[in-house]
Curated annotation (Swiss-Prot):
Active site: 138 (proton donor/acceptor), 166 (schiff-base intermediate with substrate)
Residue ranges of the TM segments: none
Source species: Limosilactobacillus reuteri (strain DSM 20016) (Lactobacillus reuteri)
Protein name: 4-hydroxy-tetrahydrodipicolinate synthase
Pathway: Amino-acid biosynthesis; L-lysine biosynthesis via DAP pathway; (S)-tetrahydrodipicolinate from L-aspartate: step 3/4
MF (Gene Ontology): 4-hydroxy-tetrahydrodipicolinate synthase activity
Gene name linked to the record: dapA
Listed InterPro entries: Aldolase_TIM, DapA, DapA-like, Schiff_base-form_aldolases_AS
Length: 307
């Protein structure tokens, strides 16, 4: 857990595309540097927010190579390598393990074929035993259709090559895992609205989507907590929570990309089957985020969207 000890606010970063839907590495570098400078201290590349289902194998390898060079060891980098095929997961993870600057592999609970708990243990054990990169469990039942039980996460936490979990379930389950995990096992919530509470409960932090657009406020929230200024930390979380929810009111990452484009990061559109927001959806998102009318179309938002 050494590299993850100081990583409390990690961003599940988008994949920028140009007008021809090629990956735009210049925009990726610009966004990455901005986020690091403003308090994000770790990244997931090639995750759900990075549109990994829409990337080819070769694109992922090239993306991870470029991203390792961009970050250059400044913060931990976690690359998505999971699938619902154990042998393919092992092969791809070992391929990614050869890339400089990739510190961990994010391995999702197998979607679609929906293994039971024994199958999950067998899958993650086989992967962890066979790869040259520490892995992080990605437990996101809302997308996979099946949930890894809290007891199963705890069981797997004792494997020497399973370093952490990104947990997208209830706070009660997160609390159980924090209480019963192996001491060297890191726990991150993948639910932005749980960011403050998870840290108070003893989790290591959050792997966030909202930190793209609210990195200053989230950094201030955690720093206020560490100073013992609970009133400010709580106020910030309450201010953030409805905005965090709004970033998922349409299929992700189209909302966060719309805001980033309006801020001048120019991360482009989404690949099919995810569509960019239409004008009606932009108006609804502006209202939910308390943004000026037509600001997402005019692309005149400031970098800091705070009060």
């Amino acid at each position: 857990m050494t590299l993850l000890q100081n990583a409390d606010l990690m961003t599940a970063i988008v994949t920028p595309f140009d007008d021809e839907e090629n990956i735009d590495y210049g925009r990726l570098e610009y966004l990455t540097n901005y986020l690091i400078e403003h308090g994000s201290n770790g990244f997931v590349i090639g995750g759900t927010t990075g549109e990994t289902p829409e990337l080819t194998h070769d694109e992922k390898i090239e993306l991870y190579q470029h991203f390792g060079e961009i970050v250059n060891g400044r913060v931990p980098v976690i690359a998505g390598t999971g699938s619902n095929n154990t042998k393919e997961t092992i092969a791809f993870t070992n391929e990614v393990a050869q890339i400089n600057g990739i510190d961990y592999a994010l391995v999702v609970v197998p979607p679609y074929n929906k293994p039971n708990q024994r199958g999950m243990v067998a899958h993650f054990t086989a992967v962890a035993d066979s790869v040259d990169l520490p892995i992080i469990i990605y437990n996101i039942p809302g997308r996979t259709g099946v949930k890894m039980a809290q007891e199963t996460v705890v069981e797997l936490s004792h494997h020497q090559n399973i370093a952490a979990v990104k947990q997208c379930t209830s706070l009660e389950e997160l609390e159980y895992i924090v209480e019963h995990r192996d001491p060297d096992f890191a726990v991150f919530t993948g639910e932005d609205a749980q960011a403050l509470t998870a840290r108070v409960l003893g989790a290591n932090g959050v792997i966030s989507v909202a930190s793209h657009t609210y990195v200053d406020q989230m950094r201030q929230m955690y720093d206020s907590l560490y100073r013992g200024d609970y009133q400010t930390a709580g106020k910030l979380q309450r201010w953030l929570t409805p905005r965090m929810a709004a970033l998922f009111m349409f299929p992700s990452p189209s909302p966060v990309k719309a805001v980033l484009n309006a801020q001048g990061f120019n991360v482009g559109s989404c690949r099919l089957p995810i569509l960019p927001l239409n004008e009606e959806e932009k108006r609804k998102l502006e209202t939910a985020l308390s943004l000026p009318t037509n600001s997402l179309t005019a692309k005149n938002l400031p970098l800091n969207l705070g009060e």
